[in-house]
């Protein structure tokens, strides 16, 4: 089986080296990002980033879930990112 795969790869490399290189680059692009040390931090940043940002609204005094100011800190802290 390995001999057949090796023969196929050798034959393909002889006929179409550009396709082989493009498939290798594409395969590495899929495989390598999870192995990167930055992958962990990008996941942590994406979890801490809010999907919706506060919009200034007129407070009539009957909105307990609205922050008093749009820039009030809410959600998970990013202090771990500042300490890197």
From Swiss-Prot:
Looking at the UniProt entry, the stretches that span the membrane are 19-39
User: Which key words tag this protein in UniProt?
Assistant: Acetylation, Electron transport, Membrane, Mitochondrion, Mitochondrion inner membrane, Respiratory chain, Transmembrane, Transmembrane helix, Transport
| Disulfide bridges in this chain | none
Q: Which residues carry this modification: N-acetylalanine?
A: 2
Query: What is its subcellular localisation?
Result: Mitochondrion inner membrane
Pfam families tied to this protein = NADHdh_A3 (PF14987)
Give the primary localization class.
mitochondrion
Keyword presence, Iron: no
- Give the source's domain of life in one word: Eukaryota
Under CDD domains, the record lists:
NDUFA3
**What GO cellular-component annotations does this UniProt entry give?**
mitochondrial inner membrane; respiratory chain complex I
Q: Is the Nucleotidyltransferase keyword given for this protein?
A: no
User: Do you know which InterPro entries this protein is assigned to?
Assistant: NDUFA3
Q: How does it sit in the membrane?
A: Single-pass membrane protein
The entry's function note states: Accessory subunit of the mitochondrial membrane respiratory chain NADH dehydrogenase (Complex I), that is believed not to be involved in catalysis. Complex I functions in the transfer of electrons from NADH to the respiratory chain. The immediate electron acceptor for the enzyme is believed to be ubiquinone.
Query: Partners and quaternary state?
Result: Complex I is composed of 45 different subunits.
Q: Which family does it belong to?
A: Belongs to the complex I NDUFA3 subunit family.
Query: What is the protein name for this chain?
Result: NADH dehydrogenase [ubiquinone] 1 alpha subcomplex subunit 3
Q: Source species, please?
A: Pongo abelii
């Amino acid at each position: 089986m390995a001999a057949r795969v090796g023969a196929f790869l050798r034959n393909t490399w002889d006929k179409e080296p550009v396709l082989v290189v493009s498939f290798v680059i594409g395969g590495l692009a899929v495989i390598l990002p999870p192995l990167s040390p930055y992958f962990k931090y990008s996941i942590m940043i994406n979890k801490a980033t809010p999907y919706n940002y506060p919009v200034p609204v007129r407070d009539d005094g009957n909105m307990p879930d609205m922050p008093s100011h749009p820039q009030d800190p809410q959600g998970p802290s990013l202090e771990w990112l500042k300490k890197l």
